[in-house]
Amino acid sequence: DEAETRTSCLVPANDADRKALDRRKPAEVICPRPGLYARRAKWELLKRHPDIRALMVVRGLATQHPDWVFAHVSAALAHGLQVSGRSLGKIHLATNQTAHTESSGQIVRHCVPDEELAECVRVGGVRVTSLLWTAFDCMRSLPADEALVVADSLLRKTGRTAWWLVRTIKDAYCGWRGIGRALAVARFADGRSENGGESMTRAAIIRQGLEVPVL
């Protein structure tokens, strides 16, 4: 119940707890990832909310691995940004520029500059890259429609404007790979978009060269 209240998967405190949970599988309990548990009834209720499921996994992993710093869409979820369901299949972690650990399986590692790693924050018990870096990292690498979902939700969360986002990205990340893509998304960002579906529809309209609707 405590884990569910925190929107997290449960991490057993000891081997005895783990064995007790395993005995309740699969009727009552499921394992979204090794070592992480959730009540089947709760998990099934969230079938149409993959973002909440993904956030539960991220928070569970943060309990398992308190030294991990989450990045990209995993960090976006922790920050409360909206993310397209198409982006939620993997776990994204930050690594420094000298580390030689590679992505593998369901883990994607993102090289993050040391100055940004120094700015990592803890949100809801999860260590994550900063809000601005997280949004920029998503905007420069995701498909344009999914990137706009993140950009719109950032402006919705902060109450800022597209002009502010363009100016801030130029000032903070000039010269960074992918800045052109991020700026192209930022110019069309609008915090008045109510949800990800609306953002993706607007992205399709922009891509077709049609007049962008006034929100």
State where each predicted segment sits.
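Residue-level signal for short amphipathic helical patches enriched in basic/charged
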Residues: L142, R192, Q208
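Hydrophobic alpha-helical segments and helix-packing faces
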Residues: T158, G175-G178, S193-S199, I206
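A short, highly charged nucleic-acid-interacting micro-segment common to nuclease
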Residues: A62-H65, V185-M200
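Short gly/ser-rich loop at a beta-strand->alpha-helix junction or flexible surface loop bordering the NTP-binding
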Residues: D1-G178, V214
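Helix-loop-beta segment of a Rossmann-like dinucleotide-binding subdomain
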Residues: G178-V185
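A short acidic/basic microdomain associated with nuclease active sites
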Residues: A203, G209-L215
